[in-house]
Amino acid sequence: MTRKLFGTDGVRGTANTHPMTAEMALRLGAAAGRYFRPVGAGSPRVVIGKDTRLSGYMLENALTAGLTSTGMNVLLLGPVPTPAVGFLTRSMRAALGVMISASHNPHEDNGIKFFGPDGFKLSDEAEAEIEAILAGEIQPAQPGNIGRAKRIEDGRGRYQEYCKTTFPSGLRLDGLKVVIDCANGAAYRAAPEVLWELGAEVIPVGVEPNGKNINLRCGSTHPQAAGEAVRAHGADVGICLDGDADRVIILDETGKEADGDQIMALFAARWADEGRLRDGTLVATVMSNLGLERFLGARGLRLERTPVGDRYVVEAMRRGGWNLGGEQSGHIVMTDFATTGDGLLAGLQFLAAMAQTGRRASDLARSFETVPQLLQNVRYAAGQEPLKAPGVQAVIRDAEVRLNGAGRLLIRKSGTEPLIRVMAECEDEALLRDVVEEIVAAVRDAA
């Protein structure tokens, strides 16, 4: 059974355009409700969280209508980070968790992703089954079995208290000046409060959401504002989250960025030294830098690569019994603490390393030298398949021959946008540029 509606991170699109319409959200809620509440079952509960996008109100109400129509009882969390939904689904014994967010995308976009009762994102197979239900006639509940919906006020507080329990016992952040950029998104209240309660001097950025400014010139995809704040306030470190707070970028005391690869390298090395890194293995995607793989290998550790998408990282971690993984983009997954990427928890672990070692952020955030990497995106029109064009395939084969033994080439379709991503790594930067430019030109011609 294949998926057509779901991408690598749920269902996404432009708000009020298929598939992100109120009508589709209602039907999707009903299909998910029927999947998680078979006909004749009791009245299981579902938690729904959202980020701060304007369209979140519309989709929240439509999903609620669909879910209650099949007999699900809905608990509305309001704006909370994506990982909070995973946590609260388990904590509140819900049969289903739903997050309304398009993560790092602009406010015009939105998305819907589902979590199972274990707090993990649904498998491809489960999503395909929901799509199959969606394609048919969805049987509603009997009038007396329609679900109820209510807003709960303590969901965010529960998550914040849990976050603090993941911080080393007895350790405090007193004396640390921390810039936290919440991208005008879901963590705009949770993240600053947790840091302050742990003792940090907090300088908040991106904490004034208005429905249209999520990820706008702020957050993990635009860390310049946080970098300016770090320098202006003489902060020790900056933590940049994205709109739903499931990814993080660290800024050192000069405002220089450290991506997910550098964060994972630090955690892997520390956890290995402490005997906490299971089987000496870190799980990361095919996008992670070759330098990370070499760094781990030099320490007798192993890198397990997966397809792009934090859900595939998590699936590999669960299969292998590993407890640390993530993506270069800043999804850091620590299954000892969470069921999905959690930017705030990863930020806390970085701060713990600073507090325990007394070292500067710049010393901790540069574990390895990256191999030069070049990534370019090429947009294509709906219905086109540029990677199947003979001319494109010929250029790719030639590039693979030229890079053989000297670097790495990765070309893939985005799972969330109509983009072809062309990425290459090579110590020879001239060869690197030539290879990427030739492939990009061929893809553009075919698109």
UniProtKB/Swiss-Prot annotation:
Its EC number is 5.4.2.10. Pfam families: PGM_PMM_I (PF02878), PGM_PMM_II (PF02879), PGM_PMM_III (PF02880), PGM_PMM_IV (PF00408). The lineage of its organism: Bacteria, Pseudomonadati, Pseudomonadota, Alphaproteobacteria, Rhodobacterales. It comes from Cereibacter sphaeroides (strain ATCC 17023 / DSM 158 / JCM 6121 / CCUG 31486 / LMG 2827 / NBRC 12203 / NCIMB 8253 / ATH 2.4.1.). Binds 1 Mg(2+) ion per subunit. This is Phosphoglucosamine mutase. GO terms for cellular component: cytosol. The modification Phosphoserine is found at residue 103. GO terms for molecular function: magnesium ion binding; phosphoglucosamine mutase activity; phosphomannomutase activity. The active site is at 103 (phosphoserine intermediate). Its cofactor is Mg(2+).
